[in-house]
């Protein structure tokens, strides 16, 4: 597998993003619009992207939910005995482990986790997520204040190593269930 440091591998790096939406207008109108926003988002309608070993789907983002301009949440699914990219970013993140077991490495230190645990990645930490379970993928809810960091132009994010480009044996046809 050839990896290039500047390789733009994922669609989310290619698409146009809204980093900060315009904040202008009458307070009464903005407040009315805020009250009209849905408070429940049906994530089953959002497809998973990625693969073949790590999949992601956005749940809440400034692009999809104007009520939430400073937070985002997504679900990551990583197949057994695999891992995500080794990377770092300026924003902190909280990972709630929904299913499976695995470990993270944060700035060289290993931390084991399993379903029901929460894992915190601090600001500026170089980290990587691993799915250790032999039979079940790791399913993780990720919550970040990344939009707020982007607003303050704290844009640094870098991949050190990409995830595997080939599926793990026995998981060649895996797709997360919606």
Predicted segments with their positions:
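Short acidic-glycine-tyrosine-enriched beta hairpin
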Residues: 108-124
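Short histidine-centered beta-strand/loop micro-motifs
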Residues: 67, 83-89, 112, 130-132
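Glycine- and acidic-residue-biased ligand/ion/polar-headgroup-sensing regions
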Residues: 79-80, 90-102, 108
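Conserved short histidine dyad/triad with adjacent acidic residue
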Residues: 57-61, 72-88
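A structural feature that tracks compact, well-ordered secondary-structure segments
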Residues: 74-76, 102-104, 124, 128-132
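Ligand-binding loop in jelly-roll beta-barrel domains
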Residues: 67, 123-151
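A short, N-terminal "cap"/entry segment at the start of jelly-roll beta-barrel domains
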Residues: 1-69, 156-178
């Amino acid at each position: 597998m050839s990896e290039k440091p500047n390789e733009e591998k994922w669609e989310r790096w290619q698409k146009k993003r809204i980093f900060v939406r315009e904040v202008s207008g009458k307070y009464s109108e903005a407040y009315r619009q805020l009250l009209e926003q849905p408070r429940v988002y049906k994530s089953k309608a959002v497809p998973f992207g990625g693969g073949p070993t790590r999949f992601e789907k956005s749940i809440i983002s400034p692009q999809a939910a104007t009520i939430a301009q400073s937070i985002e949440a997504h679900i990551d699914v990583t197949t057994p005995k695999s891992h995500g990219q080794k990377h770092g970013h300026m924003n902190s993140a909280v990972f709630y482990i929904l299913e499976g077991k695995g470990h993270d490495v944060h700035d060289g230190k290993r931390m084991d986790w399993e379903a029901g645990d929460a894992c915190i990645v601090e600001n500026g930490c170089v980290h990587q997520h691993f799915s250790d379970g032999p039979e079940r993928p790791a399913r993780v809810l990720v919550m970040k204040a990344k939009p707020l960091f982007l607003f303050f132009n704290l844009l640094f994010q870098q991949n050190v190593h990409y995830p595997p480009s080939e599926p793990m044996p026995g998981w060649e046809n895996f797709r997360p269930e919606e």
